[in-house]
Amino acid sequence: DFCLDIHSSNIFVREMPQVRLNEENAERLLPFAKMLNADFVWIFSSITVLDATLAYSLNHLGVPTLVAEMGVGNRINREYSQQLIDGIFNLMSNLGIWEIPEADNKIAVREPIISTEGEVNFLTAKESGIFVPSINSCGNIHMGDAIGDIIEPIEGRIIQHIESPVDGIVFTLRENPVVYKGALLARVHGGRV
């Protein structure tokens, strides 16, 4: 038995195709996560995983369960969807659930970046305003590269300039322009600063 809990992100941020798992189950689940064709695997500390989630409950009962998250809430991204579908067929093939047709021989999957919580930087709004991104999508970034600005909407002045604190990869990017103090703007994998 195996469970894959598939989510889009919320309506506020865009997520690179990723698999999330609890560090308590990482040794057992990481090999499965690598089969899912995700760009990113994020291993959370036990403290950040809610006891009431499907993944927590099933893993606690011994059913291997992963959470796949991608895109933006209430939207379908064809490229991300196809990427995950390929990963699901690869996982099913490796679990002996599905046999790859001989003509295809093998499903090519990406080697994901594996991250722990200590390697993720959360960039948040210091003031309320309008977030205007400087980058179009998630991906590689260098320390000091612009991620975006928060604009004061009445006067149009920049009240916060957001730069990457590390060389790494942006795997979460603000999608909804309206931000309040403390709102998540981006997550960057690449180590703590």
Residue ranges and their predicted role:
Residues D1-V193:
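Structured catalytic-domain cores with a bias toward divalent-metal coordination
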